[in-house]
């Protein structure tokens, strides 16, 4: 039976979340459109000039994914809503799903991406966690927007391993027109090395949910394996695929992904090296924790949302340098770059942050001053 999802989800997720980070109260306010505001907290590090941060929308409720078409934003909230933001107006749209949305700590309505023909079809793709009599799982589905409500349509992929932690969840359509999904190991590290499991993988599928004929393993959605909890995915202008991945306490990773390769977890992590396994392009090792989530690419650099790092991190693919571009705004869940502008969402209402007034928020910042877009 279809479920109309409730905002009570936030109270449930706070009671079920991990205790390794400070928890804060949930936000039950309606989203609002903020007046332009220059935040002194959004700043560059390493002596760089401060960036002017504009707040686009406030009172978001555990936002997880940013989708955008023209001047319209669609923000997926983990409790099971889509917030539409357009021309200074907002609307929190309900989502009706075929399965009961899980309220576990890191589960819920996660990845969300608009179909290429969305203006005509009103179709989007979503990754969500659910619970039934057989257990907890993740699935990839289409959502159809009608009369301000998103309804589950086609089931593309089901029974992706799920648990209170390590659900992965990012969805993106690649330059090849295929749908990619990041999946976590569901707190069972062994499945990341199991070629028959959908957990701990980067998955690749056609937009109708079928398996592409050129996937690296016959009759398999698996594109790469040996991942712990990847939550970010992006492509450079030469179509190179990159992902961001949560490490075990530390040892977070930014990886360059190639079809069919093994990225090591749980055999190696961070700076460790072993034949037949790929070590990351960037990692803090065991000395720091980023908790990286959504990511995007711009001008030779990767921009990564950091939850524990409480920043937007920039990784220069040519020089190997890395720095904080934005900091001081708390946990950051997702980023999106378009026309030289970086958009990002805070995630301080997820039960692990310390929410300030009117959080969470959608922000905007110009990446370079040679463009006034």
Predicted ranges, named:
Residues 10, 102, 162-163, 194, ...:
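N-terminal hydrophobic or amphipathic segments with adjacent small-residue motifs
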Residues 6, 45, 222:
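Residue-level marker of regulatory loop/turn positions in helix-turn-helix DNA-binding domains and
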Residues 19-181, 290-322, 340-353, 358-370:
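Acidic, Gly/Ser/Thr-rich repeat motifs that build Ca2+-stabilized beta-propeller blades
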Residues 22-35, 107-109, 119, 186-324, ...:
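Beta-propeller domain segments
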Residues 169-170, 333-335:
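Short, surface-exposed beta-strand/loop micro-motifs that present aromatic residues
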Residues 13-16:
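C-terminal motif of bacterial Sec signal peptides marking the signal peptidase cleavage site
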Residues 2-10:
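Sec-dependent signal peptide recognition
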């Amino acid at each position: 039976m279809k479920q109309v999802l409730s905002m009570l989800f936030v109270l449930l997720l706070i009671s079920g979340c991990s205790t390794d980070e400070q928890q804060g109260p949930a936000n039950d306010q309606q989203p609002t459109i903020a007046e332009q505001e220059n935040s002194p907290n959004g700043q560059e590090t390493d002596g760089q000039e401060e960036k002017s941060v504009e707040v686009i929308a406030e009172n978001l409720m555990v936002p997880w994914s940013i989708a955008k078409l023209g001047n319209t934003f669609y923000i997926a909230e983990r409790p099971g809503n889509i917030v539409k933001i357009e021309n200074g107006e907002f609307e929190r749209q309900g989502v009706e799903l075929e399965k009961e949305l899980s309220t576990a700590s890191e589960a819920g309505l996660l990845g969300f991406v608009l179909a290429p023909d969305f203006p005509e079809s009103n179709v989007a793709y979503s990754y969500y966690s659910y619970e039934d009599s057989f257990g907890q799982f993740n699935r990839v589905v289409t959502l159809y927007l009608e009369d301000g409500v998103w309804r589950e349509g086609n089931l593309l992929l089901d029974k992706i391993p799920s648990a209170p932690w390590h659900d992965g969840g990012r969805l993106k359509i690649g330059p090849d027109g295929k749908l990619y999904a990041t999946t976590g190991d569901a707190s069972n590290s062994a499945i990341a090395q199991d070629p028959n499991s959908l957990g701990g993988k980067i998955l690749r599928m056609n937009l109708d949910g079928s398996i592409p004929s050129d996937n690296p393993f016959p009759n398999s959605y698996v594109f790469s394996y040996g991942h712990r909890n990847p939550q970010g995915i992006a492509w450079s202008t030469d179509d190179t695929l990159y992902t961001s991945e949560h490490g075990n306490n530390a040892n977070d990773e930014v990886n360059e992904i190639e079809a069919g390769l093994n990225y090591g977890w749980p055999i190696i992590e961070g700076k460790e090296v072993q034949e037949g396994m790929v070590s990351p392009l960037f990692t803090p090792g065991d000395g720091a924790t980023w908790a990286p989530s959504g990511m995007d690419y711009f001008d030779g650099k990767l921009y990564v949302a950091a939850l524990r790092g409480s920043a937007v991190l920039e990784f220069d693919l040519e020089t190997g340098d890395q720095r904080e571009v934005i900091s001081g705004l708390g946990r950051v869940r997702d980023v999106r770059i378009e026309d030289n502008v970086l958009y990002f969402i805070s995630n301080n209402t997820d039960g692990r942050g310390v929410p300030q007034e009117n959080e969470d928020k959608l922000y905007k910042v110009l990446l370079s001053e040679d463009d006034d877009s």
